[in-house]
């Protein structure tokens, strides 16, 4: 994985969250997966292990991509964002780029993605 910056998510108990001045976001599910340790081991360069992570998170949450309103996804390269959107079930395989091309991923679009600009905006 290419990494050039960091991020943080602060997780608190329901009791602490209730004492905060902002409305909390509840974590309904999580998933993590690694498909290979180096690119030479990849059998399919059009797929990522995000599909496995998504499957696990959706199962834990009892939800699916149609239940989400927006997403923040890893975007080390432009193609990474499009492929990850496909692996998360947000677009059919080979069609992830259309979320951006057609404006659906933009703030105010049908399914906003990386409304903070994503990692690529930090260069």
Where are these regions (language model features)?
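Glycine-centered helix-boundary capping/hinge motifs
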Residues: 61-64, 89
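Short acidic capping loops at alpha-helix termini that bridge into adjacent secondary structure
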Residues: 64-69, 93
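Short glycine/threonine-rich loop-to-helix capping motif typified by GTGT followed
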Residues: 39-43, 75-97, 109
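Feature representing long, continuous alpha-helical segments
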Residues: 48, 52, 56, 66, ...
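Condensing-enzyme catalytic core mediating Claisen C-C bond formation in acyl metabolism
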Residues: 1-52, 56, 60, 104-122
